[in-house]
Amino acid sequence: MLKQILSEMYIDPDLLAELSEEQKQILFFKMREEQIRRWKEREAAMERKESLPVKPRPKKENGKSVHWKLGADKEVWVWVMGEHHLDKPYDVLCNEIIAERARLKAEQEAEEPRKTHSEEFTNSLKTKSQYHDLQAPDNQQTKDIWKKVAEKEELEQGSRPAPTLEEEKIRSLSSSSRNIQQMLADSINRMKAYAFHQKKESMKKKQDEEINQIEEERTKQICKSWKEDSEWQASLRKSKAADEKRRSLAKQAREDYKRLSLGAQKGRGGERLQSPLRVPQKPERPPLPPKPQFLNSGAYPQKPLRNQGVVRTLSSSAQEDIIRWFKEEQLPLRAGYQKTSDTIAPWFHGILTLKKANELLLSTGMPGSFLIRVSERIKGYALSYLSEDGCKHFLIDASADAYSFLGVDQLQHATLADLVEYHKEEPITSLGKELLLYPCGQQDQLPDYLELFE
């Protein structure tokens, strides 16, 4: 079964529905391994092909290529988000995203007050510039008056006789006084312009500080309101829980894969698959289970009774194929029998639906109860287990004349009984700690596996 999935790189949705979350993660891990293996084969084939003498291709200018970064194990370097000590926790990332969104929203809200302040500031500048423009004509008028006076004096000098020494002294004194007044006026104008510029800068700086303070306060308010929002809190909790669940499942799948691989290497207690030489080539068909004593010719109906609680979801042809598969391939392997006797194991059941298996387990009310049923969807088995959190289901691969959980084919068992005995002491998964403690047997008068042994 696993080989077929990996060869096609496709799993039927009905089959995927039979898998537990742990088995799904392990299966995805195996499919990823198969992808890498195929990629390496293609790369090796390409290298062999390129090593042959061929006509060199003209290299393009500024040719680009991709080189994978390798880790310490010489494999492609992979960074698993959230597992490194430098990675930010999920809630910290959420807080940063909220803070950034709140800041952008506060900036948008502050855009209108910013425009209003800018217009007021521009109007005040225009008013003050008009005031200085009014002051400027007075200075110019003063200059014009002094200029006219100087021209008049020059004309008078031309018509007058040569001035005396005293007149020259008086003229020089008046000219120097005019120059001093002009210098004082220019200095006053420069001081006014500098003061106006300084006031302009201080006003602009003050307005910017006020707007920034308003933005910061608004950002904090928006961020606080979003964090206190019940819908956002619920969404955050769900996202965080889903992220933690995915991370734990992936980690658990890797741990289970390593644990079972190590168990297979150590060969724990002879539970590994026995050599095919020890299995007879043509084993004899085991005896049928004893029928109930009350079934006589008069009471036995013309049509065999079926478990009325089982709802058949498969077509008759598909169900017949599964029954034929069990009789032809599984009976020679003593599927469903006790390990040391020819009696049917109490945990073995026939073709049961998922709903019926859950009902049987819940009726016991004992965590650790389990049963193995023939799958209603595929040629294989499913182990149903009752834990503290509810019912779990694990698909068992029986495609290679051996039994192992789908996705972890390193540790295989010769019979279903061997698999059950092994997991009475060894948990199925490291996270769930599922130990097979209490077999869940038949509850109806007629066993649900009769059709498999008829």
From Swiss-Prot:
Compartments where located: Cytoplasm
Tissue-specific expression: Ubiquitously expressed. Aberrantly expressed in some cancers.
UniProt xrefs under InterPro entries: SH2 (IPR000980), SH2_dom_sf (IPR036860)
Keyword Phosphoprotein annotated: yes
PROSITE patterns: SH2
Keywords on record: Cytoplasm, Phosphoprotein, SH2 domain
Primary site of residence: cytoplasm
GO molecular function, one term: phosphatase binding
GO cellular component, one term: cytosol
Keyword Phosphoprotein included in the entry's annotation: yes
Domain SH2 as annotated: residue spans: 347-440
Pfam families reported for this sequence: SH2
Composition-biased stretches (Basic and acidic residues): 107-120, 240-259
Modified residues (Phosphoserine): 118, 124, 261, 315
Annotated region described as Disordered, given as residue ranges: 45-65, 107-131, 152-177, 237-302
Described purpose of this protein according to its UniProt entry: Inhibits estrogen-induced cell proliferation by competing with PLCG for binding to ESR1, blocking the effect of estrogen on PLCG and repressing estrogen-induced proliferation. May play a role in T-cell development and function.
Assembly information from the UniProt record: Interacts with ESR1.
This protein's name: SH2 domain-containing protein 4A
Protein species of origin: Homo sapiens
